[in-house]
Amino acid sequence: MVNRRSFLKYLGWSGAAVTAAAPVALANTNPAPNVPATITGRVLGNGKGIANVAVTDGYSVVVTDKNGQYSLPAAAAAEFVYISLPAGYAVPHERGVAQFYQPITAKNGGFTADFKLEKLAVDDRKHQFVVWADTQIISKKDGEQLKAQSAPDLRDLVASYPKGSLFHGIGCGDLVWDHFELYADYKEAIGMTGMPFFNVIGNHDLDLDARSDDYSARTFKQQFGPTYYSFNRGQVHYVMLDDVFFIGTAKKYIGYLTENQLHWLEQDLKLVKPGTTVVVSLHIPTQTGHKRRENLKEEELGGSVSNRKQLYEMLKPFNAHIMSGHTHVNEKWEEGSVMEHVHGTVCGAWWTGPICSDGTPSGYAVYEVDGGEIRWYYKSTGKPREHQLRLYEKGRVKTASEYMAVNVWNWDPKWKLEWLEDGVVKGTPEQRVSHDPWAVELYAGPDLPKKHKFVDPTMTDHLFFFQPSASAKKITVRATDRFGGVYSETMTLA
């Protein structure tokens, strides 16, 4: 039996393949222009030039002049010319996929690319975005579930906000599970939500027949454009990065940001005022609690970003949030001015059950932006917004038979938890590293779950324990998030 920890290691936390190695590509099958080209054009809003818009080929960055014109000396290896969408304009999209780029088809050393935008009728300093991590569909059946459950849930969430509210989505990698024909289902799903999606490449979005990392994203690029880019909405600057570095065999990869990206990011961030809120999205987290929770001797190379310190250094002048997925668990981390949100999955436990391996419900995160301030909550698929914790009766956790337990999946250290007996506050539940008992029931053992037997429950930091009094008849756990939102769950004891 391969348990989940072993499977994740096998899958690429430290790298090896689940399936047989694909044939090695002996040549570049997606050739980029082989001569430098000068790219010129205009960025227009309602027919008028827009000044100070960043334009890039992924190597160098220029800005438009007062007439919206630019001239960009593109690198020989550049594949796209694209803009950092300016604040105040609608996001162009096709079937939900944001359109901010054009493939470079240089002729005689020159290429022209114009970008036409429409001015928003509303102030975008207030807007919302959602993070869909690891939709990870491997079959048409998974794709149908995505379209029948997840997409309508998100569409209904948008409808619950005031009419005209601005939303965009972030597809945080592993959009599919190696089966690229299912991108059509993913696109259909995001198209159903009514919002533009900006997409990040994950390890299961890689071309496994590539001979090196340079060519491992050719299918993703055909579907979604460049793998690293930025855009602006309101007072927030958004950055998407590719941190999955393919090492050229089977499914082996590490979490790593290439020098090309870091050099581009330096240029991009020079155009952003210090103190600005910057949201960086990537697939592999920059850090996790996996090593500590599982008592590992060292971090697994495919489980976090090896050169994260360099990224943190670049983000120091800003109020930075990092959005990631990959681990199929939900957790939060803060270091200096950087806060990382590692997201639970849209697919739950690879579409085998309603929760992730740490007990987090299948779902997504919702972020509400007002100026430079961001508030957030977790939205469980098929559940109301208020569903933020799950209470377990005494003995449900077999290793703590005299205790009740509560899973608060979006917890961070600024939350406040308390338990009440018959309406009287008794104390604060104790945080322990443990397994969610429902995840144990669904996924533990060699025969569970039937669909993907590699799935196992994983240790989590967001499980809390308390010992109720023998006389207690009604137990309530009350959780207050860092923004003052209060959630509770009550259980009547026999």
Each model region followed by its residue ranges:
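Short, ordered, surface-exposed loop/turn motifs in non-cytosolic proteins
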Residues: 36-40, 44-59, 76-78
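Extended active-site neighborhood of metal-dependent phosphoesterases/phosphodiesterases
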Residues: 87-95, 100-107, 180-274, 295-323, ...
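N-terminal export signals
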Residues: 6-28
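Binuclear metal-dependent phosphoesterase catalytic core
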Residues: 338-422, 456-490
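Aromatic sugar-binding surface patches on proteins
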Residues: 436-465
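Beta-strand-rich domain onsets/edges
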Residues: 24-38
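N-terminal active-site segment of His-dependent metallophosphoesterases
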Residues: 34-38, 45-46, 90-184, 471-476
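Short, acidic Ser/Thr/Gly-rich low-complexity loop/linker segments typical of extracellular
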Residues: 59-73
